[in-house]
Amino acid sequence: MFFRSEAEQAFNVDAIESPIMDTVIKKSAAVYSGEPPWKDVKNGIRTINFAKSLSSETARLATLAIKITIEGSARAEWLQQQTDAVFFSIRKWVEYGCAYGTVVIKPNGKTLDVFTPDEVLITDYDNQNITGMIFKDTYTQGKWYYTRLEYHRFAEEKQGEETVRPYYISNRAYRSKTPDSIGDPVALKDTKWSELMADSPPILKANGESLDGPMFGVFVTPQANNVDKSTPLGLPVYAEALEELKDLDIAYSRMTGEIHDSERIVLADDRLLSPAGTPVNKMTPGAAATTHLPKYVRNVYGDGTDTFYQEINPTLNTEVRVNGLNALLSQIGYKAGFSNGYFVFDQKTGMVTATQVESDDRRTIQYIKDVRDQLEKCMDAVYYALSVYADLYGESPAGEYEVTYDFGDITYNREEDRARWWGYVQAGKVPAWMYFVKFEGFSEEDAKAMVEEATPKEDELFDSKYKEE
């Protein structure tokens, strides 16, 4: 990371190095952005960027119908407002975490910032929990590139006979003419970060105790890091399947290349291509040049007594190649945490019941639950950091809060649910208006009015009976 030396010098600290993970991070960024090392346009090897699809699908399922509710006090209401402001970004944040293995979410006093591993330096961690970190933030103004380094850490200090661990935040700004260097130091007041302090005072709880954790949250993928077991960073969800992703790109490129080269070709003697009605003695070489030919016809100048004609119809091996693609997709999906056959190329599976889905995709369900657990852990830390900010800057009154996470069922089948609820209505277990609200889009008021209008009145029943008598 090009800002490592400047950061270490500015804050007089040694960042925890992991050359192996630095390589993984760089490769992950390239693969996720659609520029894997095996891409070779010259030799026809393209990429379908399935690493992006894996990360996106994992994030989609993990955040399916997510709902975060915070209750308990005025502080809870303020935290709910902060959540609602970034709610639709949560899925993207999870995707970045799946793609890079780690993503860090940090309050900035106004909203939440998100950092990938190539934008941070770890300075301290305890039992795989990161407690010290340097963040890199940038912006461009005119021809200048501005960079801010923000250092978060705990520090042990003596207060009389007691040892306390206050939390500190330090900021340093830089300016450069190129994006590949942070350049020279510049005063914070000369940047858009002018309201920030270079060094914060000690941050402690109101009772003088140390904070319960750092002022940021870290999302890591659930699988163990077998590349560097000592680092708290996670691995991309596709880390175990890089070789298969390479094979998939090669196989797909070969298949599409075969399709591109499969155009029907007709080789025909120029004497066969003369305009209709031309006398035989006038069928001279080059006469076909004045005739508009279909694009698949190639003119062959014959010099023999017989005219030449041949059709070339290449045979496609699509079915065989698709089977190979499906085998690779299944292996990639399994290594990423999904059930066998979750990813299939060009295949219709038809309708299945929720019970079948739960049985077939049990591995997927467990994997997504693990990802959701990591997301909850990260967001809990973020809410704690936000609450500390609220205390420091008086954003809201202090108070207890309780966070509830609700996720959608990935085995949910709407048609089955609809039939089940209609059965409840017919059995008299629930009122009909609830069914119309849940499945037909009615408002509660309109649904109740419609049901009431359709319900025969008791007086009308008696009147009808008397009229018949």
Which residue stretches match the model-derived regions?
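Extended, helix-rich architectural segments
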Residues: 1-144, 466-469
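Extended hydrophobic-aromatic, low-complexity segments
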Residues: 17, 341-345, 415, 432-435, ...
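Generic structural marker for isolated residues within well-ordered, non-membrane alpha-helices
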Residues: 76, 329, 383, 432-433
